[in-house]
């Protein structure tokens, strides 16, 4: 798996899924997960972006609350994911996104796309 560790400005370390394209990158995209974590769906989006020439990085936005959280889409998993949102802090989330952007900044222009949690 293509995991890396990011360090936010406040010193917190979080995991991110990162994929690089073959050849010179066209830029980079930060992929903000759904409430289900950096699961296989989010990883597949990153993989497709890399196939199209972009460095793609998906920081694990729940690592501060529930490290390595990822789930599927059953009603029980939806309930669990929604419960995590009660503890989600936007200020620290922005620090984590900034760390992700910094990790891929050498690829050129950096965009961001969000799904559910970040959409």
List PLM regions with ranges.
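N-terminal cap/leader regions of alpha/beta-hydrolase-fold enzymes
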Residues: 1-119
């Amino acid at each position: 798996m293509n995991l890396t560790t990011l360090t936010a400005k406040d010193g917190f370390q979080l995991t991110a899924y990162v994929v690089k394209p073959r050849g010179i990158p066209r830029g980079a995209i930060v992929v903000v997960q759904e409430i289900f974590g950096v699961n296989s769906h989010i990883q597949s989006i990153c993989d497709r972006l890399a196939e199209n020439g972009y460095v793609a990085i998906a920081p694990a936005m729940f690592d501060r609350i529930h490290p390595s959280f990822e789930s599927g889409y059953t009603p029980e998993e939806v309930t669990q994911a929604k419960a995590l949102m009660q503890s989600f802090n936007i200020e620290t989330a922005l620090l984590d996104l900034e760390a992700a952007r910094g990790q891929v900044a050498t690829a050129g222009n950096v965009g961001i796309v969000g799904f559910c949690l970040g959409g």
